[in-house]
Amino acid sequence: MKTLSIEPLTRAAFAPFGDVIETQGAKQIPINLGTTMRFHDLAKIDVADEGGRPLVNLFRGQPRTLPFEVTMLERHPLGSQAFVPLTDRPYIVVVAPAGDLDASKIRAFVTSGWQGVNYAKGVWHHPLIALGEVSDFIVVDRGGDGRNLNEQNLPESLWLTDDALLAVGA
């Protein structure tokens, strides 16, 4: 069984794949007569290719149990895809760089709970891996014509395990 190591989600580690959406380290702008803090420009939403438009959706992820077998990844070649959790439950993100899928470059991250992610256009990723309970996410992605989904099976399964999750203190 080939196990994926799991890393804590940080902006620096995730930068090759897109953006981490979080308030920590974000530019803050007080608005509305100082009664609201705006955390500004948290992700680069990129959905305009081939006349695309932004969609705002709610995804309800069923919890996955570990060990969890990763057998495939998907990508959206025409637009980014942002996931913003509506709870503070950690979830796992599995990604690989854009371009031809190279299974040796697959990485896994665990969020702190409130962190969101924005997958850059063309980045390979696994569908939502919620942990513990049913979890809701606001998802901003692309609507419009054109084929914006590719799925690819991995040459061999990779596993996410409790031990790998515990190794990062999650």
From Swiss-Prot:
TM ranges are: none
| Keywords from the named record | Lyase, Purine metabolism
State the Gene Ontology BP annotations.
Answer: allantoin catabolic process; purine nucleobase catabolic process
State any single GO MF term.
Answer: ureidoglycolate hydrolase activity
Tell me which cofactor or cofactors this protein depends on: Ni(2+)
Copy the pathway line from the protein's UniProt record: Nitrogen metabolism; (S)-allantoin degradation
Which EC number applies?
4.3.2.3
Its recorded reaction(s) are:
(S)-ureidoglycolate = urea + glyoxylate
InterPro entries per the record? RmlC_Cupin_sf (IPR011051), UAH_cupin (IPR047233), Ureidogly_lyase (IPR007247), Ureidogly_lyase_bac (IPR023525), Ureidoglycolate_lyase_dom_sf (IPR024060)
- Give the protein family: Belongs to the ureidoglycolate lyase family.
Function statement: Catalyzes the catabolism of the allantoin degradation intermediate (S)-ureidoglycolate, generating urea and glyoxylate. Involved in the utilization of allantoin as nitrogen source.
Assembly and oligomerization: Homodimer.
Q: What is this protein called?
A: Ureidoglycolate lyase
Give the species this sequence originates from.
Burkholderia mallei (strain ATCC 23344)
